[in-house]
Amino acid sequence: AALGPGRDLSSFDSAVRASTMDYLTTCLETAGQLGAGILAGPLYTGGGKRHWLSPDEKKREWMLAVDGLRELARRAEHYGVVLSVEPLNRYRTSVANTAGQVLRMVEEVDAPNVGVHFDTYHACLEERDLCAALEQVLQAGKVNHFHACANNRGAPGQGVIPWEDLLGLLVRYGYGGHITMETFALGGLDSSWV
């Protein structure tokens, strides 16, 4: 799901949260009708949300994201859709940047139809060790979507990402979900920013 400006389950503005829930519910309904089976992305907030918050505000933002995802998971179950929550790099959001943070978020949501969307581009910017980050969520049994993208937004093999190691981990842990190529043309805009 593309969540641009004004789409944010973690917003302190209840009207924004309600509007976002309505939008995501429409996405779930559409996914259900199409038989898509999964709704993936940074479902807790849109890109471009980078701000400093006090520790108390940060906890509140986190809980709003968790509560919103919990409600979204309940709705997703009605449509037979699984949620896959994607961490975004620090230049896109300040809510959840690493696979470990999203794993914690997913564990707090505590719904069987919610998992972690591992994106190699964002992970390359945020993780100290890509393989260790992926293995952490694989060990938890929570990876349910995988974006394959080079560190420069190109096709796999055009950058510095250790593809053989990452794919080896997916095989070793029996990952059976989709592997989606997410590449962008040189000079192109990220559609979620438009």
Q: Where are the regions that the model predicts?
A:
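Active-site acidic/histidine proton-transfer and metal-coordination neighborhood
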Residues: 10-115, 125
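N-proximal short alpha-helices
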Residues: 4, 75-78, 136, 153
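Active-site-proximal loop/turn and secondary-structure-junction residues that shape catalytic pockets
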Residues: 4-6, 43-47, 87-91, 120-122, ...
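Generic detector of short alpha-helix boundary/capping microenvironments
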Residues: 8, 90, 165-168
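Histidine-acidic metal/acid-base catalytic patches
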Residues: 35-37, 96-118, 123-194
